[in-house]
UniProtKB/Swiss-Prot annotation:
Superkingdom classification of source: Eukaryota
Entry GO terms, CC: NuA4 histone acetyltransferase complex; nucleus
Keyword terms, alphabetized: Activator, Chromatin regulator, DNA damage, DNA repair, Nucleus, Transcription, Transcription regulation
The protein's name: Chromatin modification-related protein EAF1
Biased composition (Basic and acidic residues): 288-302, 309-348
Compositionally biased spans, kind Polar residues: 108-118, 126-146, 185-203, 251-261, 275-285, 550-559, 580-591, 1094-1119
Assembly, per entry: Component of the NuA4 histone acetyltransferase complex.
Domain HSA: 685-759
Biased composition (Low complexity): 147-161, 366-380, 560-570, 1463-1542
Region entry Disordered, spans: 108-531, 550-611, 871-906, 1088-1127, 1220-1244, 1292-1324, 1462-1542
Subcellular location: Nucleus
Amino acid sequence: MTEVGAADLSRLLQSKRNECSSIVTSRKRKLRELFVVATQSEGLPHPVLTNPDAPTTTPAEWQFLQANDINQSKTLNEASIPTRPTFSLEVLKKSLAKSIFIANESVPKQTSENSNKSHVTDAQDEQQSNRASLSTKSDAAATSTRPNTPETSTESATTANPVPPPAKNTQAVLPPADAIEKPIPTTSPDVPASTGANANSITNEEDRSDPNEVASVPRQPQVTFETGTKGEHVETGTSSVKSGHGVGDSAVTTGVPSTVKPSADVTRSADALSSPGSTAQSATTPAVHDDASTDTSPEHEGPQYVEPAEQKKIEDGTHERDTDKYHQSHQDGDIRAPSTKDLEDRVLEAPPDSAEAQLLQESIRSNVAAENEAALNSESTSQEADTAISAPVSEDVNMSDVDDRVVKAAPTVGEKVEEKRAQQILDTDAKSALATGAPAEISGSKEIPDSQEEAPEQMDVDAPEPKASTESQIGAPISLEKLDAADTGPSSPTPAHIAEVATPPEPVRQNSPPKAERAVTRVSSGAMRPKSVSEIVGVTPRQTPTLEHISTNKSTNHQLTPLTSTPKSPTLRHRHISAHQRQASRSQPSTVVFGKQSKKGEEKSMVTSQHDTILPTEDYYTPLFVQGFAGSSSWMQPIEKILYTANKTVTTPDANLAIQDHQACKVLRRVYHLQQHDKWSLRQPKRCPEPTRPPSHWDVVLQEMKWMRTDFREERKWKRAVAKNLAYACAEWHEATPEERKTLQVQAVVPPKMKPASDVAMVDAEGTNHLTPDLVSSEDVESIDNLDDLIEDFPETIAPSAIFNLQDEDVVFGLRRTAAADQLLEELPMFGAPLQVPKFDLTGPEWDPDAHWRRPALPLSKYVEGHMKLVSDGPPRKRSRYNYQNEDSDDEGEAGFVSSDSTPSLPLPSATDEVALFNPEMKHIRDRLYVGHQFRPPSEYPMPSQSFFECRSPSQWTIAEDDELRSLVREHSYNWSLISSILAPRSIFNSGAERRTPWECFERWINLEGLPADMSKTQYFKAYMGRINTAQNMINIQNQAMAQQQVNQANGAVTPGRRRHQSIPFRVERRRNQKHLTMLDAMRKLAKKRETTAQKQQHTASQNAANKKTNESASQRPTKTPGEYSRLRYERDQALAEKMAQFASRQEAQRRAVLQARAQGQAAQMAAGTPAAVQAGQNSAQAAAAAAAAAAAANGMNGVGRVNVPNQLAAAAAAATGQARPRMPMQSPAPASMGGVPAHMASGLVPPNQMNSVQQAQMQAMQAMQGQHNRMPMPNPPPDVSLMMRAQRISEQQRAAQMHAQGGPGTPGQGAVGAQQSPPAQMRNAMNGVNGINSNPMNQQSFLNNAQAMMAQFNQGNLSSPQANGLHMPSGPAGSIAPRPQTQLPAAIQAQLNQLEAQYRAKNSSLTSEQARQMATEHLTRLMMAQRSAMNAAAGTAGGQGGLAGSIAATTSPHQYAALLRQQQQQQASAAAGSPGQQHQQPHQAQHQPQQQQSQQQQAQAKQQQPQQQVQAHAHAQAQHQAQQQQQQQRQASGSATPSAG
């Protein structure tokens, strides 16, 4: 992202200009070639193709170039390409006949005409195999006038380097055709023979080019004939010429250039198909060359022969045409050898000046010479045939055509005559070359290899290589210059007969090093074209070349031809798959085929582009277009709808796909609109220059933070190094022997402990102290004395800035303070610039704090060569051990926008290796920790039960799965859990056939391998096998029973059941995967169930709608206004007030009657004797009841609203203290508590109605209080009339009894009193019976009878019938269901409950408030029960019978218990006073007696209890003190919270 320098910019611009000019030139040449190909069918004009800037020949061509001129920003318009003329059938027949029936030329002219024949080099063919498909050899004429200085200098340079580089390999030029005298028999049709391409002229161009560049210019397409015109390359037993360095062995025999080309070996068989692209056709004639070498495989490349480079410059178009005719003369047919008569007829038919006539004439002469030498060559033919068959075949052979064999045909001309003639010619030319000195330009005698041609549009044609050339040039003198060039081309193995006959006059052996194999062939690189005419006519499949472009700097280094190798050890060469496909697929006949233009871009730039070709389908606007089309079309749905209607599972990436696509389309739409409005340019302007921002304090802080980060990192490295060294030192000490430890110890003396000196005069101490050292400047902190101390105490402590040049594990050494050390430290580099305080100068700041991110914009947009891709990190994943970054690295990615590649270039090793037990090097540790090779079952899982084996479905195993199970058991050593996890299918839903549990794998392995003999006898495996066998027997029994049932019920309509299979695993050939079918079936059933449910609901709704009356209006409750509700409330309150007033008046009358009765009783008691005690007790009870009634009446009349005061407790308090206002603010308990009130309190109890005078008026207030506290009680129900009437009846009975007692004697009076009080006793017993205390069936029945009578009496007033209070049923108006009000606890007990609840919560914080309250209540209840039992024990009543204990047993709340306790105190006081208190316990005993015997037993009980009451009084006096304390606390707590009634 930084700016480019001026020098680099100029070089870059120059390279871009050169590239642009080369692109324009190349495009123009290609356009002209295209026009020529489209308009001409046979000959192609060479000057036009070699010089793209040449003037156009026709106006049509000029118009075509103008219509497609790239300088005018025009692209290729295919409509402007002219239509190619049709190729007539006659021309096709003539071309095929001419190419098939041409014979080899045996005696070519040895004049300058023959010597001027151009033999094209295969090196140039390899180098320029990718050039323009229509370039020809006529450019040699244009370059013949080129000065020969470069060639001469190149050759001289080559002479100085006799040993060529091993990586260059080209082919030598063929010798003249006059040495070729023998026709060649047919060979394998699909294996082109190695021809002159293996013997073409080579020049020393490897020193002038980069070996890494590849020639990439389209080459001339060619048409080759069926091979077989060239002798088979066979291994020689006597010659040491290898295919890798055979060139050197044959080419260094002499330094004289060869001017005579030896004849070909006519007895060779076809070579293996290697690189057919080397068979290039000449551009001046439509003739087809079958002898062009396609053999570049290492096994079939023979020696190379080089001619001087000056010969190339004297060639002209005629010479090239002669050369092509010469090539055609070697194409004697693989099908048949034409006769001289046929050739003469064709000569007469052909035009006299045409190339065809000349070629036919030469073919006639070749046939004549061949017939003369046929007899002499018959013997050598059979011998070479055997050798040819045994010759190795190249890897490039198309092995698909196995029926094509190497077949030897008619015998050829004697090769000895040919060899002698060729040797003479070689010697003659060599002497003439030596006479002229350095290689010079010899007219008509030498050739210039095409590899030296520098024209970028050069196109070469392979020349045939007669086999005799190898044997002739073995003895021919060849210059060292040719040696270098020859060594760069592929060579063919020397035939056996050549090695035997050749006798070099000056044998010079050169041991060249073996050449390295190259993995790229001309076929694989597309440099050659594997298509021949024989394949066109249907003999072999054709091969299509891949064309490439060549850069301006071309040389032999561009060749992709592999070096040769020894035939005995052929090396594999990589070929493209596409080449094989083209070979196998294209076998249709055709004529001249021109190569297709490669899609690969021109590689002419200085830097090779690494970007892939952008296909039209990879346009980054494609998602936008697809989205637009999906939105407008009806058959194409967007991704959102597709995902919404998906039938399968949609994963998170699938769901994110729609979001990402929407985001991408949003960005692309914006970019598209900007481009449409010319606001999105590929060239971006540079950033506008802005004034430099003055540095701020924050910039300094950031700099310091970065410096501290670096400092801390370096210090961490240093500390790690120190720790590492210390750890190694400790380990070394630990492992060392005592002797070694002595050597490791530091020779140091422990200083003696200093004894605390006593007080010494300072005068004496001055003489013994050392002198104070001189002060050292603050900079010199490391003096010599301090240095020793530092080394001893802290040997590895030093600043991190001094360890720049050391390794991470090294520690800084001590450095003595010297001038050299100071200079060294000053010259050490620093990690960062020292911090500087910024100068806040707005005119010219010293540095730009924004320089690290504010950089000049790139001249090109990133979208020019890149694609717009939205990359998401995906879902968060657990961090792997391999996913870490080097924390000590300084690469912070501060410019993260520059490089978007956050992935490390190299894979990081694991951060820790503690979990590397499965590595191979950890196997010994693994074996020591766990014996894995020992046989064991999956004991980490429980053994399956027998029912599992009976009910399971058998698992299915294929042969592959069985083999995998065996291998996993061997590999993982009976680790059944791991084996199961590997074999288990990767799916959540696994059927029984796919079950791969550890026990299932173990069972299958036992079925395959069997249990070991010693293991099968153990009890463990006996039980295991027993379960399996028993389960199978049970399945068999079930199947038999089912079959028997079917037989017995054969005549019935019983559906036969499915026979069960064995549940053991079994093998199948292929397991049917019914997983998806099962899932679909389940989905279908679920959908059907839902549809059925919906239909039923719809049907039910429709029926309900039909059954409903249409005109039936919904009954609406009359709505009342708030005023109406207020009036109703007022009326009800008034009615209640009137009732309460009436009730109060009655109670007042009763009170007065009680007082009057008491007074009368006291007077009667004084008159009578014994009955006075009983009457006194009754009078006291009546007085208490009257006082309670008076208090209740006062509360009701005053309307203070003490609605929560229990009536029973108020009565008890009134009876005990005689006061009219109780101080217990407690809510009245449930009516059931009345059942537990003893007989002596029954007369004083008043119904709760007297306390509820203003309950309805305070309903809203009570509800508000309930909302404030969840434990506030509900308002009391309406007054219970039954209790009121019951209390009234009791009062009346007591009054009547009192009056009766006053009127009669004592004993009858007492009996009357007992008789009058019996109904309340019965009622009390019945109520207690309902409560489960002292129950009696007779009493219950009597109570129910009385209750029914009372219900019948009070139902007339539309009041609810009184219920048994023991049933805990609330009473109220008829039809109302009111909840039972909760008991409101006093403040003292509430505080105690809260304290207990807090303690429970502190012990267990998980308790809820309800649980804590319940536990506290239970604990407090237990405490109160314990206190009550203590009271009973103190009172002397066993089992809670009689007295206060009986009454306590019937109580249901602590409030009643407190009230009873106060009444007990009153009783104790009266008992202590005299006999009236002693008679107070009579009602307790009377409640357990039947009604008939109660009056008779009362007198006896009174006499018997008189001594007991005295003992009990003493016990009560002891318990009284304890009860008074609790009572006092309750009174204080309740009195503070209880409002007064007055």
